[in-house]
Amino acid sequence: MALHELTIGQAREKLLSKEISSQDLTKAVLDRIEAVEPQVDAYLTVSKEEAMEAAQKADKALAQGETAPLCGIPLAIKDVMCTKGVLTTCASKILGNFVPPYDATSITKLKEAGAVLVGKTNMDEFAMGSSTENSAFKTTKNPWDLTRTPGGSSGGSAAAVAADMCLGAFGSDTGGSIRQPGSHCSVVGLKPTYGRVSRYGLVAFASSLDQIGPFAKTVEDAAILLQAVAGYDPSDSTSVNVEVPDYTTAIQEDVKGMRVGMPKEYFEMGGLTPDVKNSVDQAIKTLESQGVEVMDVSLPHSKYCVAVYYVIAPAEASSNLARYDGVKYGMREERDSLIDMYHATRSSGFGPEVQRRIIIGTYALSAGYYDAYYGKASQVRTLIMEDYKKAFEKCDAIISPVAPTPAFKLGENTDDPLTMYLSDIFTLSANLAGVCGVSVPCGFSSEGLPIGLQLQGSHFQEEKILRLGHHFQKATDFHTKRPNL
């Protein structure tokens, strides 16, 4: 097995036994990037020199007895998290020259853990999209089929892990932006509970929905990555001070007797392809064979999720993105008057999808429409939260598909925003309710395209969904398959 193909767990064993060095591992990953990046276009920035320096530092720490799980491990970061001294563009022209003067809390924690950050990955502009086609700079391709999307908005991170261009990666999930690309690229994608991981230094899209989470080759690796970044942070007012369990130990516990709920509304929705349904049905049988009890649950307000999300998220985006006006930082189009400068800067700096969502959000918040749109959406969001609360009184986790279809063709839905929005129909509700969710590879379509299984857990119950996912992977081999590049 080539070094770039290793899981984090495997690489850690080899690093601790001195079989390999972090410099060997990092060079192998950088060589892999050089070989396949021209095909995949997963990265916006590759930090070769900084990565090799970090690897050298990690090797010194390992020689002195350091045993931190991520010491010397090459990781990629979605270009929406602030990295001191390294471009952070959010895949937008308006931030095309922005170099943050500080690190996001998650980045600080990863550096303290000895991780080697190899680069920043492509994404939909400001994390608005489901295909990574909304980037101002490049279009990322799915490593399993280069004519298809990797999903979005964290498509660059998912594609980088799938193509072995890093051992793990981080993204952000506002409506499915980690889980959906995880499903489309056959990697594990975890959205933690809202407040579990600090959002300090995460460039905001929708502040009540955004959450940082990991991509990995295995559930065990995802647990290691979550362990490194989870925890309370006073710099983030939405961070919650809840004890962080030992995820890597918790996932080893038996799943026998655990209860998993099937929301009938998810399986009755239109658009679910037979391949996806069959793969998820088979995954459910696999868990049942391990002693998991599967039962029906109801999430009756699921049918309103898309409508609610596409009022609340654009409304928050309209407010958050008002700061990009050409005055303090980022791109500026010089004009004679201040108003003309604002208009020119924002018109040329933001792409069409971002402009669309700002307009929708501004409309939903405007006088005369606030109660009818934003107010009503907020009320229905509360009902969605109540649905989850009732469901989790009966079960430990909720099981469903991640997406109704496998990855679609590049360009197939770019002129049809509604079809694009509906690709997140099974993932949006977890963000609206603030619960955790994970995508685990569970099969392939007749065309050889990856399919993911979604497990959702109650607030701060990540160890339960990770345990189920880990035991599912012990019984299957979907996660061991890699695309031919």
Curated annotation (Swiss-Prot):
Its domain of life reads Bacteria
**EC class of this enzyme?**
ligase
**EC code(s) of this entry:** 6.3.5.7
Under Gene Ontology molecular function, one entry of this record is:
glutaminyl-tRNA synthase (glutamine-hydrolyzing) activity
Q: Which InterPro entries match?
A: Amidase, Amidase_CS, Amidase_dom, AS_sf, GatA
Question: Which processes are annotated in GO (biological process)?
Answer: translation
Q: What does the function comment of this entry state? A: Allows the formation of correctly charged Gln-tRNA(Gln) through the transamidation of misacylated Glu-tRNA(Gln) in organisms which lack glutaminyl-tRNA synthetase. The reaction takes place in the presence of glutamine and ATP through an activated gamma-phospho-Glu-tRNA(Gln).
> HAMAP family given for it?
GatA
Q: What is this protein called?
A: Glutamyl-tRNA(Gln) amidotransferase subunit A
Please report the organism this UniProt entry assigns to the protein: Desulfatibacillum aliphaticivorans
Chain's gene name: gatA
